[in-house]
C-alpha cells in the first residue's frame, strides 16, 4: 500500500528522480526559467525552495550541504551571492509555475518555472501558451 508516501514517482526509480531534480534545479538557478511538465514543476518546487531558504544563511555548513545536493560550484556560488540576498526578505514562494499549454508529441501539460521577481523575461510564456 502507498499510504503516507509523499511526492510523485514520475515513472522513474529513486536515483533517476534524484538526478533529474538535481539537473532541473541547476538549470533553474543558471537560467532563472525552465520549461517542463506540470507534475515535474510541482515536484521541483519541493526541491528548490528549501535550497534557497537554506542559502539565506551563508555558512560553510550550508554551502557544503547545498553543494552535496547540486554538485556544481558555480551554481552554489550564484545561489549564495545573487539569489539568496535577493530573496532575503521573502519568507518563501521563490518560484512561480505558469501553465504553458500542451506538448506537441504526447499532449502532456507543460509549465514554465521561473524565479519570482528576478530579472527574467516572460517572452517564453507568450510564445508557448496555447491551450487549443
Curated annotation (Swiss-Prot):
Pfam family, one: Ribosomal_L17
GO BP annotations, alphabetical order: translation
GO cellular component entries: cytosolic large ribosomal subunit
Presence of the UniProt keyword Magnesium in the record: no
One function term, GO molecular function aspect: structural constituent of ribosome
Entry keyword set: Ribonucleoprotein, Ribosomal protein
Subunit structure, as described in the record: Part of the 50S ribosomal subunit. Contacts protein L32.
Family designation: Belongs to the bacterial ribosomal protein bL17 family.
Protein name per UniProt: Large ribosomal subunit protein bL17
Biological source species: Ruthia magnifica subsp. Calyptogena magnifica
Source lineage: Bacteria, Pseudomonadati, Pseudomonadota, Gammaproteobacteria, Candidatus Pseudothioglobaceae
Amino acid at each position: 500500500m502507498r499510504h503516507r508516501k509523499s511526492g510523485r514517482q514520475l515513472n522513474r526509480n529513486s536515483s533517476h528522480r534524484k538526478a533529474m531534480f538535481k539537473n532541473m534545479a541547476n538549470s533553474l538557478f543558471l537560467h532563472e526559467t525552465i520549461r517542463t511538465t506540470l507534475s515535474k514543476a510541482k515536484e521541483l518546487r519541493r526541491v528548490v525552495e528549501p535550497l534557497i531558504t537554506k542559502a539565506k544563511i551563508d555558512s560553510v555548513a550550508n554551502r557544503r550541504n547545498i553543494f552535496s545536493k547540486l554538485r556544481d560550484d558555480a551554481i552554489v556560488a550564484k545561489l549564495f551571492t545573487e539569489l539568496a540576498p535577493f530573496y532575503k526578505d521573502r519568507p518563501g514562494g521563490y518560484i512561480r509555475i505558469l501553465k504553458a499549454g500542451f506538448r506537441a508529441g504526447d499532449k502532456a501539460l507543460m509549465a514554465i518555472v521561473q524565479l519570482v521577481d528576478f530579472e527574467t523575461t516572460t517572452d517564453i510564456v507568450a510564445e508557448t501558451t496555447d491551450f487549443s
